[in-house]
Amino acid sequence: MSEQVALNPSEISELIRKKIDQFSVVSEARNEGTIVSLKDGIVRLHGLADVMAGEMIEFPGGVYGLALNLKRDSVGAVILGDSSTLAEGQKGKCTGRILEVPVGKGLLGRVVDALGNPIDGKGPIESSGMSPIEKVAPGVVTRKSIDQPVQTGLKAIDAMIPVGRGQRELIIGDRQTGKTAIAIDAIINQKGTGVKCVYVAIGQKASSVASIVRKLEEHGALEHTIVVVAGASDSAALQYIAPYAGCTMGEYFMERGEDALIVYDDLTKQAWAYRQISLLLRRPPGREAYPGDIFYLHSRLLERAARINADEVEKLTNGEVKGKTGSLTALPIIETQAGDVSAFVPTNVISITDGQIFLDVDLFNSGVRPAINSGLSVSRVGGAAQTKIMKKLGGGTRLALAQFRELEAFSQFASDLDDATRKQLERGQRITELMKQKQYSPLTVAEMGVSLFVVEKGYLDDVPVNEISSFEASLHDYMRSTHAALLHAINEAGAYDNEIEAKLKKAVEEFKNTGSW
């Protein structure tokens, strides 16, 4: 029989004490739930008692969801990305975080998805940090009046429906009427102005987006632009969050005292995606089967476009940027069905924005491009931001064009017209012809000023209507070659006084005497 080893009680207690001291509790308070149903990108979980609305839910395999429906016994969430790896019975955990996307100058020149992941094959993005996609819009006290223009380079817009920095200007029209073309021209025209641009493509074909990216690259505009894509093949959840993600990326520049321009192309498809999600979540449908909060979907997005004052910029940058205001200008696009602007989503967005550019399918088909209907289009705040030359020379253009459209309709029935009416019709035809502009060919303020000057002062009255575009092109070439200093002076200050008027008059008369057009 082996001898029993005598155990010293003090040694045992010392050993236990050491073990207790060395023991560390590594536990995390995580709220877990179980997937009870999964279909159409919507997951229902049981047991997530402490989840918050809009919170990220983590699933196995690094898949995330967004909590949207909070019920007494279950939580409805929408899957962000691929849900094929998930199955009923798997666990979902609360993260305590809301959805964030990367922001910063490293995103410029890149194409990203709705979550900020690069999809252009140019490697990882060097972002300045992460920022939540949902933010409270700037308050009344932190805002500043709009008094600086965003030059789109399009005569019809800059003269008649001016857009200011911090404004929300809706572009509305049927499909294939040139809505995207206006937005892309506006982005191209920001080259060299310091305005950063964000283009959000929602529910578009990958080939269409690739074509837009290629055009931006060709015109040297991609380097100041972020392209956010939630394509037609992406889930409804990504199409729903893409505008908010793009807005956050644009806000980064606004909050640092810079100017940014964001295009949402288009919000109709975002509304469709949100309607799909809401119906799958069994939310009660309302008018046109949209959920009750469809207005809030767009208002909370578009209210984030603003011009904020220097004090707010200083506060947001912790005193790094002083004496500079920041702005985010929004150009939302809405697609109408057969020109019906009184449908639910178009009327919602019209009431939220500061004006609209209405594109007419009949004008487009008759060759007037951009096909802007001057009678239905309006800019509620842009007039305060217009340069002096555009305000002075473009003021009568919109009225003359609107009157021309009315007279044109009546003149079809009248057999003989008096001289005043005939002159007004001829002037309207010349203005219509002058407002035509090729895509991807934005003009400077001075070039637009020269064009408006010749129509305002009657220098086009003896030019045949079919020769106006060649007359204008020749005039611009002449001005660039012989009066470059005058053009430069107008571009620098945007001013218009008696001296500039006299110089323009002399230059145009010289050009007409050459007969080179």
Swiss-Prot record:
<keyword id="KW-0139">CF(1)</keyword>
<dbReference type="InterPro" id="IPR023366">
    <property type="entry name" value="ATP_synth_asu-like_sf"/>
</dbReference>
<dbReference type="GO" id="GO:0005524">
    <property type="term" value="F:ATP binding"/>
</dbReference>
<dbReference type="Pfam" id="PF02874">
    <property type="entry name" value="ATP-synt_ab_N"/>
</dbReference>
<keyword id="KW-1003">Cell membrane</keyword>
<comment type="similarity">
    <text>Belongs to the ATPase alpha/beta chains family.</text>
</comment>
<dbReference type="InterPro" id="IPR004100">
    <property type="entry name" value="ATPase_F1/V1/A1_a/bsu_N"/>
</dbReference>
<dbReference type="GO" id="GO:0046933">
    <property type="term" value="F:proton-transporting ATP synthase activity, rotational mechanism"/>
</dbReference>
<dbReference type="InterPro" id="IPR020003">
    <property type="entry name" value="ATPase_a/bsu_AS"/>
</dbReference>
<comment type="function">
    <text>Produces ATP from ADP in the presence of a proton gradient across the membrane. The alpha chain is a regulatory subunit.</text>
</comment>
<keyword id="KW-0067">ATP-binding</keyword>
<dbReference type="InterPro" id="IPR033732">
    <property type="entry name" value="ATP_synth_F1_a_nt-bd_dom"/>
</dbReference>
<dbReference type="Pfam" id="PF00306">
    <property type="entry name" value="ATP-synt_ab_C"/>
</dbReference>
<feature type="site" description="Required for activity">
    <location>
        <position position="377"/>
    </location>
</feature>
<dbReference type="InterPro" id="IPR000793">
    <property type="entry name" value="ATP_synth_asu_C"/>
</dbReference>
<dbReference type="Pfam" id="PF00006">
    <property type="entry name" value="ATP-synt_ab"/>
</dbReference>
<dbReference type="GO" id="GO:0005886">
    <property type="term" value="C:plasma membrane"/>
</dbReference>
<keyword id="KW-0066">ATP synthesis</keyword>
<dbReference type="InterPro" id="IPR036121">
    <property type="entry name" value="ATPase_F1/V1/A1_a/bsu_N_sf"/>
</dbReference>
<dbReference type="GO" id="GO:0045259">
    <property type="term" value="C:proton-transporting ATP synthase complex"/>
</dbReference>
<dbReference type="InterPro" id="IPR005294">
    <property type="entry name" value="ATP_synth_F1_asu"/>
</dbReference>
<protein>
    <recommendedName>
        <fullName>ATP synthase subunit alpha 2</fullName>
        <ecNumber>7.1.2.2</ecNumber>
    </recommendedName>
</protein>
<keyword id="KW-1278">Translocase</keyword>
<comment type="subunit">
    <text>F-type ATPases have 2 components, CF(1) - the catalytic core - and CF(0) - the membrane proton channel. CF(1) has five subunits: alpha(3), beta(3), gamma(1), delta(1), epsilon(1). CF(0) has three main subunits: a(1), b(2) and c(9-12). The alpha and beta chains form an alternating ring which encloses part of the gamma chain. CF(1) is attached to CF(0) by a central stalk formed by the gamma and epsilon chains, while a peripheral stalk is formed by the delta and b chains.</text>
</comment>
<keyword id="KW-0375">Hydrogen ion transport</keyword>
<keyword id="KW-0997">Cell inner membrane</keyword>
<dbReference type="InterPro" id="IPR038376">
    <property type="entry name" value="ATP_synth_asu_C_sf"/>
</dbReference>
<keyword id="KW-0406">Ion transport</keyword>
<keyword id="KW-0813">Transport</keyword>
<dbReference type="GO" id="GO:0043531">
    <property type="term" value="F:ADP binding"/>
</dbReference>
<feature type="binding site">
    <location>
        <begin position="173"/>
        <end position="180"/>
    </location>
    <ligand>
        <name>ATP</name>
    </ligand>
</feature>
<dbReference type="InterPro" id="IPR027417">
    <property type="entry name" value="P-loop_NTPase"/>
</dbReference>
<dbReference type="InterPro" id="IPR000194">
    <property type="entry name" value="ATPase_F1/V1/A1_a/bsu_nucl-bd"/>
</dbReference>
<keyword id="KW-0547">Nucleotide-binding</keyword>
<keyword id="KW-0472">Membrane</keyword>
